[in-house]
Amino acid sequence: MKIAVLVSGGGTNLQALIDAEKRGELGNGTISLVIASKPGVYALERAANNGIESKVLARKDFENIADYSRALADTMIESGIDLVVLAGFLTIIDEPVYEAFPNRILNVHPALIPSFCGKGFYGLHVHEAALEKGVKVSGATVHIVTPECDAGPIVLQKAVEVKQNDTPEDLQKRIMEEAEWKILPEAVRLFCDGKITVENNKVYIKGE
């Protein structure tokens, strides 16, 4: 299965997927395309260093979200993409992408959904909110992307301890290393090996 990874920054989750593929841990999946929402991001270098085709589709070059989403969908359809992975992709996508890839878009969110998710909860904001609330555990969630932000069916979750003296940066790093970089490749493997079905807004995993 051909995978497109959509990125907006440094691409640490992209690197986790690349490393997993090299270890044979993406099942029948192959990362075939990296799309960045802006030029010059380090994720593009990661793609180039590993021989993966990359393209830049900058949101500012399009009049509205619908046009941008149509261009995204067309680009991925032309490349024969089977699975779309949002890996730190901070640009909103719209109906053309959902319609082209129904139940075939995965996102990783740095919290245990339904906590600390939805509009405005991205990057360090998520971890700042978790620490302000005083939670004792946080973590990461991989879910299927739907039009409602962070509300799609949950594929995998992993909890991570919150330590008393954590800064947002400390918690972000721990969640990436202990959760995001583990469950994102695993969710991709499950999808590419045909283990995931969606019924009534819930994910069922076969034979695991």
Where is each model-derived feature located?
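One-carbon transfer enzymes
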Residues: 1-208
